[in-house]
Regions:
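Phosphate/dinucleotide-binding and metal-coordinating scaffold of catalytic cores
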Residues: 1-327
Length: 327
């Protein structure tokens, strides 16, 4: 299988960057990537998008199971759960057994409009960017109450989630990381926001506390995106935060610290991983290393002050600019 990779961080248009090859053996997928010769000749960027992908022609292979740069474009637990449920519904409708889904299925199952970062994917160079299902566009702000109800019903009984409810959730939620119920929402001005809904497993109003912590971070001088809080039920509040990888309709390339440091899920102090790895990366490839290292220190102190223990390398990341990466 060949997946054609496009980028839209070097110009206003989507440019063919290279091909991700997916080979399946014994039910496992194996990956390799090859840059487009034309893209290599024309690109003005000299910053690696993945520690395992260098600026030369020919196939390149990941040192781990997969390339981190493409893993960042995949959904995490919540989005994968929705895509799995969609496959079971489709299999039931077609009277067949559900397919075993692989990473490439999840990668291509994300709706293109709301995909994280500035990479886009096709399986046909003359076709549409995937996923292109018109039924799964980001819903308007006015549907938040309905989306919260759909996510609650899914958590209670995923078999309850029929095709109608699933479309309400999968269209905005499949592109996002993390395990909590969430969705992309389009604000009246056209900007994209992330809505994080209350969960049946919450022991307190998590959304309200996230908003409090977010506002405290801003008061302490940390760089945080715009946020809001809405309440639609007795279960708790919905916390909303503006997407930082969009500037209007322009896509901004984002990569997790996990990817750029060449780490894998579960990396911790036990294997030598630390904030110093992020500092070293910023010193070598950062556009504003001094400023970003100060920002990182503020995050460390703030997380300690508010007892934030959910602090791992997927919760830190970098934005690509023409001058380098920024925290």
């Amino acid at each position: 299988m060949e997946i054609y990779v496009y980028e839209c961080f070097s110009s206003s248009e989507s440019r063919f960057m290279g091909t991700l090859f997916v080979d399946t053996a014994k039910r496992n997928e194996h990956y390799s990537f090859e840059y487009s010769d034309e893209w290599l000749k024309e690109t003005k960027f000299s910053y690696q998008l993945d520690p395992d992908i260098f600026f030369y022609s020919g196939r390149q292979f990941p040192s781990k199971n997969e390339f981190g740069v493409f893993a960042d474009s995949c959904p995490d637990r919540w989005g994968r759960a929705l895509i799995n449920r969609r496959e079971r519904i489709q299999a039931d409708r077609e009277k067949r057994k559900p397919r075993e889904l692989h990473t490439s299925d999840y990668l291509l199952g994300v709706y293109d409009e709301t995909r994280m970062g500035a990479l886009r994917f096709k399986t046909d160079k003359d076709g549409e960017f995937l996923s292109n299902d018109s039924d799964v566009a980001a819903p308007p702000w006015t549907t938040l109450r309905t989306l919260e109800e759909a996510s609650r019903n899914y958590e209670i009984d995923e078999d309850f989630l029929n095709d109608k409810w699933l479309k309400q959730l999968i269209k905005p939620g499949s592109s996002l990381g993390g395990a909590r119920p969430k969705a992309n929402i389009e604000a009246p001005d056209g900007s994209l926001w992330i809505a994080k809904f209350p969960s049946k497993n919450d022991e307190c109003n998590i959304g309200a506390w996230e908003k409090v912590t977010h506002d405290l971070a801003k008061l302490c001088g940390l760089s945080v995106p715009e946020s809001k809080l809405e309440t639609f039920s007795k279960l708790g509040s919905t916390f909303l935060v503006k997407r930082f990888d969009r500037d209007g309709k322009k896509r901004i390339h984002f990569s997790s610290a996990m990817t750029m440091l060449g780490k894998t899920d579960g990396a911790s102090a036990d294997d030598g991983s630390s904030y110093l790895d992020i500092v070293s990366f910023l010193k070598s490839y950062g556009a504003n290393p001094k400023q970003d290292i100060v920002e990182l220190w503020k995050r460390i102190v703030f997380n300690m002050a508010v007892n934030n223990t959910d602090d791992h390398l997927r919760n830190h990341g970098f934005i690509l600019t023409k001058s380098g990466w920024v925290l």
